[in-house]
Amino acid sequence: MKKYTIYKHIGNLSKRNNGWTKELNFISWDNREPVYDIRTWNAEHTEYGEGATITASQMEVLKKLLDEASPLKTGL
């Protein structure tokens, strides 16, 4: 298991029936530069699923794209 430090828990995106939550955190993996991170975690943050890391510059671009996007609807 990789070493990690969660510097800031930004928020939960969803919660599964098994108690795991999909979260957005600001985290450092293996003592590297902290990144934004979206992945599932157990309640104790001792286990995690696959996720995606986003650098600060990528987060700025993502935020701009989301701000410019109209609300999307499912069932298209």
Report the location of each language-model feature.
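Positively charged, low-complexity terminal tracts
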Residues: 1-76
